[in-house]
Amino acid sequence: LSRMLVGALRCISGGFLRADVLQVAKSGFSSLTRDEADSLENYAITHGINRGKWLRPFPYGDDAADMDELRVRLISPVEALRDALRRAKTAGDSVEAIFRFLEDTNAYDRLMAREETLLSRGMAAEATQNRQVWTILMTLLDQLYALLSTQKANQRDLAQFVESGLTGASLSSLPP
């Protein structure tokens, strides 16, 4: 979850670099399966997809239509977040946009499904860490809202605040 959110914020602030887009794709919290993310990665490398090319239909190769469908599924929520952040007048508005992004991507449901899978495999410690990710993220966003809600914050600053907050989290091992 942390990789998806940080990757999405980096996409927005950094101009959709391939590495950031693929971080979102491979996070386990995008709408793509692992195989779809791998296929999209191979396509992007083969055809030099980077930056603004992620925001336009893919024209290359026999599999362009299939790959473009994956692109749309992956990029649409990030574009919606980008647009909401652009409209945000304050850091509080930006934090609310992140909450909506997490809702729109079903992040909590995906996290709970992962927790159930871990518990069914007898991995209670990992399941606990999994749940802690959500708690830490919500606490971080609540704190950002409380501290910065009326201040103007740009997208780059917000991405750094979120990434720093998640990096500094007190978990022995922060899962993706």
What kind of region is each of these model predictions?
Residues 1-176:
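Polyanion-engaging groove/track-forming segments
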